[in-house]
Amino acid sequence: MSGNTFGTLFTVTTFGESHGPALGGVVDGCPPGLALTEADLQVELDRRRPGRSKHTTQRRESDQVQILSGVFEGVTTGTPIGLLIENTDQRSKDYSEIAQRFRPGHADYTYQQKYGVRDYRGGGRSSARETAVRVAAGAIARRYLAQRLGIEIRGRLAQMGGIELGAEDWSAVDDNDFFCADPARIPELEALIQEVRKAGDSVGAAVEVEVRHVPPGLGEPVFDRLDADLAKALMSINAVKGVEVGAGMAAAGQRGSAHRDELTPAGFAGNQSGGVLGGISSGQDLVVRAALKPTSSMLIPGRSVDVHGEPVSVVTKGRHDPCVGIRAVPIAEAMAALVVMDHWLRHRAQNADVESGTPVLPARDRE
C-alpha cells in the first residue's frame, strides 16, 4: 500500500488501523536542536482525542504518545522521530455485521475493489483514527515554526449544518467543545447535535485554519504551489470533500476590482487571496477552509450490497461522531503545520541567500 508518506523534506509516514494494537509514524527531516518532549505532543493530541466531549464519539482513547527515537536528552537529533500511540478501547464486535456488507458512503467497497481484502473493524486503515499520528507529527512542526519563525496556527469550526459561525473571539476556541470562535452560537450547536443524535443521523461541517506571521516566499511553482499543497493536505483528511483558499468559491461571483488585494506602503488592502499569490506566500495570513461531509455511520438503515453483490440493508452500530467536523479542527491545524514546515525547509534549501531588495509589506490583521 503506497500513499502513506506526506512531504518532501519534512516527511511523515503513518501506519496502523483503527482496531489494531497501535498507530505509529515516522517523522523525518526535523532539524536538530529543537527542544521536544512527549508532553509537547500530548497537548495537541488531547485536543483531538475521542471521548473528550459528549458531542463526539464515546470511544475512549487516552492517545498517549511515545517518542521512540530521534530525541536525546530533550532535543531532536536530526534523525527520524518514531512515534507510537496504542489503541486501548477497541470494540470490534460492533462491526461483525459489516464483515460481509459494505457501509454506504464509506471506504468499505472501494478498499475491497482495490485490495481484494479489508479490515472491516472500525474501517481499518480508512478510519479517522489514523489522524492521531498526524496530529502528533504536526505538533513537532508547530513547535519548530513557533519557536524559530514566530508562526502561529489556529483553527475553528466555521459551520455546522446550516449554522454559519463567525470568528468573533478566537480566545474562546479551546474553552468549548466545538472549537467555536463564536461562543454566543454554542447553544444552537448543542441543540443541533442533540437533534441529529436523537434522529440517529449525522451532520456536515466546515473548519477554517489560519496560519499567521508567515514570511513571504514559501511555495514551489508550478506543481508544488503552497495553496495546492495546502489543498492536498486538507483533502487527505477523512470526510473532507472540498477546500477553499481565501475567497475560494466566492471568487467566482466577484469582480476583479473587488477581489484583487491592492498593495500600499502600509500593507495589503485585503486578503482575498488567502495569503498566496502565484503559489507563493505573500506574507499575509494563510486562510484555508475545508468542508466535511456528514458521516455515513448512522442508525438510519441504508441500502447497500454484500460481498456477493446481493442487496442488503445496513445499519452502522458502534461509537461514532454525529459531526466529524468538530474533531477535524486540530487535524486540519496539524496538516497546515506540516505543509508550512515542509515548504520552509524547501525554501531555505534553495533560497537561503536570496535578498529581494523589496520591503516586506505588513499583513492585514483580520481581528
Curated annotation (Swiss-Prot):
Binding site for NADP(+): 48
Pathway listed: Metabolic intermediate biosynthesis; chorismate biosynthesis; chorismate from D-erythrose 4-phosphate and phosphoenolpyruvate: step 7/7
Enzyme class: lyase
Gene Ontology molecular functions: chorismate synthase activity; FMN binding
Catalysed reactions, semicolon-separated: 5-O-(1-carboxyvinyl)-3-phosphoshikimate = chorismate + phosphate
Cellular component terms (Gene Ontology): cytosol
Binding note for cofactor: Reduced FMN (FMNH(2)).
UniProt cross-references to Pfam families, sorted A to Z: Chorismate_synt
Keywords, sorted A to Z: Amino-acid biosynthesis, Aromatic amino acid biosynthesis, FAD, Flavoprotein, FMN, Lyase, NADP
Listed EC numbers: 4.2.3.5
GO BP terms, alphabetized: amino acid biosynthetic process; aromatic amino acid family biosynthetic process; chorismate biosynthetic process
Keyword set includes NAD: no
Complex and partners: Homotetramer.
Main function: This reaction introduces a second double bond into the aromatic ring system.
Family: Belongs to the chorismate synthase family.
Protein name according to UniProt: Chorismate synthase
Organism from which the protein derives: Halorhodospira halophila (strain DSM 244 / SL1)
